[in-house]
């Protein structure tokens, strides 16, 4: 049985277009399991459709976009989970480079501001800085973030203050290093977050 889907895709090239528009495409699926597979097939029909992609395995975070109103990764979104009509927009809250591609500069600026690396002035041992199993377990759920920006760009506080508010992804990474027993900058890291906008713009909405 044929499976035809309708795609409404956000189209905008700021160098050419006066305003964004939505364009409609129809695609009959032939084995495309994931949304990214369908996008690759659509690009064969219209080479001008622009989006990011790389690993296709949910590791790089390149293909994050807004899918039917929710941010997610195209490569991890199964076509069977989607309705017949699929609306694709760029991640909200960041400048659009073209179509589904956004400028991630502000997102990575906030990420870099939390110093996402171990800081330890103690001379390194011959092999490695050891952790107990319990200390290592403290980091579970913290280091897996792939920096796709799906969470930060779903956050209204990040939309309003992207140049000041660290955002969910940045705060997660900040805690990842604060919780790391090998890091010696805990107090400085906390001081770095002590600002009405950097941390305390986070609200339950």
Where in this protein do the model-derived segments appear?
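Short, contiguous acidic and Ser/Thr-rich linear segments
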Residues: 22-34
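Short, structured protein-protein interaction patches enriched in aromatics and acidic/basic residues
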Residues: 55-64
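Active-site phosphate-binding and catalytic loops of NTP-dependent enzymes
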Residues: 46-52
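A generic structural motif
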Residues: 78-79
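Eukaryote-biased recognition of intrinsically disordered, low-complexity regulatory segments
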Residues: 2-25
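Short strand-turn-strand beta-turns centered on an Asx-Gly dipeptide
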Residues: 66-70
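Ferredoxin-type iron-sulfur electron-transfer modules in oxidoreductases and energy-metabolism complexes
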Residues: 31-46, 86-205
């Amino acid at each position: 049985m044929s499976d035809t889907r309708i795609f409404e895709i956000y189209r905008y090239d700021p160098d050419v277009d006066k305003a964004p528009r939505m364009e409609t495409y129809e695609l009959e699926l032939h084995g495309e399991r994931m949304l990214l597979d369908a996008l690759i097939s659509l690009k064969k029909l219209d080479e001008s459709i622009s989006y990011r992609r790389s690993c296709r395995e949910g590791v790089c975070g390149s293909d994050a976009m807004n899918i039917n109103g929710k941010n997610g990764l195209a490569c991890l979104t199964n076509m069977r989970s989607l309705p017949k009509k699929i609306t694709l927009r760029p991640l909200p809250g960041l400048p659009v480079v073209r179509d589904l591609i956004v400028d991630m500069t502000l997102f990575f600026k906030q990420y870099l501001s939390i110093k996402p690396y171990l800081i330890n002035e103690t001379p390194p041992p011959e092999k490695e800085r050891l952790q107990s199993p319990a200390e290592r377990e403290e980091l579970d759920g913290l280091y897996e973030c792939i920096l796709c920006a799906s969470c930060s760009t779903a956050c209204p506080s990040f939309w309003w203050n992207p140049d000041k508010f660290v955002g969910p992804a940045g705060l997660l990474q900040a805690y990842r290093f604060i919780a790391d027993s090998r890091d010696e900058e805990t107090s400085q890291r906390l001081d770095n977050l002590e600002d009405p906008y950097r941390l305390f713009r986070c609200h339950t909405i």
